[in-house]
């Protein structure tokens, strides 16, 4: 299994995994649909602004790695589907919960089991946080080698975060004594965590407003 994906490649693969599950009637994706999905504001971190040429180049790189396939499907518009997992062309096999967790890690970066349970539940069922932790354990012990890694717990946090192992851009985690640069890194991490939590609250608020409108109430 190739573990040398760039940020843009992980975003494209994550999007294809996501849309295959959440909007199967619109899958495979055209180049235009893929660009829009890569750049959407919700369920993404970091938020990107990729142009069509960049996404096309990323698709070409993934095709050379046999992780994406493009086909016309009887029309003039070429559409793309992944070969990342659970296909006859690759050796990586994942169950539904593993796919959901890996997808969220590809789309959002490092997350805690609690965050993963909340976010991945749109793609697979997780009865509780323990179910998410069990899924992470299976990914850690995968027969092809660890597919995720647990990061050292950040100061003041109850849970450790996990990140995927499909990228060559994974940065080593500093475990040395705190320094000025370490303090800055910790501060930035706290800001990122707050941004993620705020985004989740905004999504919940939007969903609640939608439900209220469906009930005929004015917000």
Curated annotation (Swiss-Prot):
Disulfide bonds: none annotated. Pfam families: DUF480. InterPro entries: DUF480, WH-like_DNA-bd_sf, WH_DNA-bd_sf. Belongs to the UPF0502 family. This is UPF0502 protein HCH_06091. It comes from Hahella chejuensis (strain KCTC 2396). The lineage of its organism: Bacteria, Pseudomonadati, Pseudomonadota, Gammaproteobacteria, Oceanospirillales.
